[in-house]
Amino acid sequence: MTATTSKRKKYVREMKPTWWKKLDFYKLYIAREATAIPTLWFCLVLLYGVISLGSLDSFGNFISFLKNPIVIILNIITLGAMLLNTVTYYVMTPKVLNIIVKNERINPNIITMALWAVTAFISLVILVFMYV
């Protein structure tokens, strides 16, 4: 079997490292994808908290760890990242969710408001049960 080689030069599109800085859409995309880093931080803190529930001494250390100003700042950054992730998810969902009722597509604002209503309701229920 013989292999034929082409004398044509392959087209390779140049991809610069700053491709995402051209459009605001790309910047938001990168910011949304970067929320994985604060999510990892939150998961590690949560894991540390669950492990420290084993004894009172380690749980006391966990509480003092949470009171550290650096940890508080990192948790505030994590909260902001999760809010960004939630907002972009709720804006994107009606665009990809195609619900048709009586041969008409549902208004995207209704879906977005329903998502926020469910979020508010669940948050309220958690807050009520936390203090009861």
From Swiss-Prot:
Keywords: Cell inner membrane, Cell membrane, Membrane, Transmembrane, Transmembrane helix. It is a multi-pass membrane protein. Its main location: membrane. SUPFAM superfamilies: Fumarate reductase respiratory complex transmembrane subunits (SSF81343). Pfam families: Fumarate_red_C (PF02300). GO terms for cellular component: fumarate reductase complex; plasma membrane. GO terms for molecular function: succinate dehydrogenase activity. The chain crosses the membrane at residues 36-56, 70-90, 110-130. Disulfide bonds: none annotated. It is found in: Cell inner membrane. InterPro entries: Fumarate_red_C, SQR/QFR_C/D. Part of an enzyme complex containing four subunits: a flavoprotein (FrdA), an iron-sulfur protein (FrdB), and two hydrophobic anchor proteins (FrdC and FrdD). Belongs to the FrdC family. Anchors the catalytic components of the fumarate reductase complex to the cell membrane, binds quinones. This is Fumarate reductase subunit C.
